[in-house]
Amino acid sequence: MKNKEYIKTDVVIVGSGVAGLFAALCLPKDKDVLIITKENTNECDSMLAQGGVCVLKDLNDFKCYFEDTMKAGHWENDPDSVKVMIESSQEVICTLIDLGVKFDTDKNGEYDYTREGAHRRNRILHHKDETGKEITATLLDIAKQKENITIVPRTTMIDFIEKDNVCQGIVCEDEYGEMGSIIARDIILATGGIGGLFLNSTNYPHITGDSFALAIKHGVELKDINYIQIHPTTLYSKKKGRRFLISESVRGEGAILLNEDGERFTDELQPRDVVTNAIVKEMRKYGTDHVYITLPTMNTEEAAKRFPNIFDACMEEGYDITKDRVPVTPAQHYMMGGVKTDLYGRTSMAHLYAAGETACNGVHGKNRLASNSLLESLVFAKRAADVIANDNSEKKEDYNEVDLSSYPAKEERQKEFKKLIMDEIKEKDKDFYDKWCNIQG
């Protein structure tokens, strides 16, 4: 059948993570906002973010924070993007606090800033070891109460509706296989990364880069699509499924990495790609598929309080991280590249925006600095929302009628999308592809 019935709204946001939710909440109340999300609203990678969220504590830290971000990114970052993110950090963190987000405090009631790999100073706010969950759940609860925001779970974007490089909406499919169209003045892509395409990833398996595949199909510009972060420390397990992250904040609190002989072999607080390479070198040296992590600076009670989820996950596998050597191994974690945007989330297609891990404005360069992901999502989602809110230009609805019967079945579509993305990565960086992408999900 052809698309004669459709939903019409002001803004459609694809994704219910931090970027999508914060963008929705930053839009004015007179904008009707429709959020669709691929699975249940709580099944997004933002919920999994453990370590924390960076903030510029004071102006004296600006130069150091800027340099730490640039150095971690191998100086391939866009400096303007980095400046905007850092300069906007205090504002968005204050907004989160006003919305009810709780960050941990020390015994004096002051915010407890921690430090992670490649940070020279403590500048990371956290909520135990579930900072992403605290932020995302708070934003989600507020969004559900807003009359102008509607959230539709278990609905997948399968195409853009566009003509002459102007986006008019999206085609989507619900959990029952029913297809439909959403026509909107503005569209924000916030679908996360591509972890679901890998055999070993910290991401949810349904995070499969749909926005990237559709961008390729429709000629929307991508940037640094081969810049994919492998996190050095995920809990080693023979079980299939998503890999459990052992947050970098554990190493920030004194955890050390050991090889098969029980020897330290690297500076644990180097950038993620450096630590990952050091681990891979040790695994090859000993012919193993893991190394070990242990946290000698805390006792059991302290670790259980500071890192409750990590502590429990290790205990379920039979390890007390404060006493035992816990096996860890690298796994795909984050996408630095993505749909190319400017500093306001605008893509190369009119009225199509991208935010969060889906977007790439160059802020992370070749390797993301720990705990910059939540901050980046918040800062640039707000900037995209601000542009949409202040855009009073006329937009003509002009698009070809959508033939819903022309779309392939779900399994065939997923294979097509995966091939589009992997071929693009292979073309950009065959060495990375051969090393990591040949081991796919």
Indicate where each model-derived feature is located.
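An anion/pyrophosphate-binding glycine-rich loop and adjacent beta-alpha core
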Residues: 41, 214, 220-320, 387
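Short beta-strand to alpha-helix junction loop
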Residues: 79-90, 123-141, 152, 202-209, ...
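Glycine-rich loop(s) and the adjacent beta-strand/alpha-helix scaffold that form part
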Residues: 186-240, 244, 374, 378
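Conserved redox-cofactor binding core of oxidoreductases
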Residues: 98-178, 190, 234-237, 257
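Glycine- and aromatic-enriched mobile tails/lids
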Residues: 1-2, 7-9, 18, 26, ...
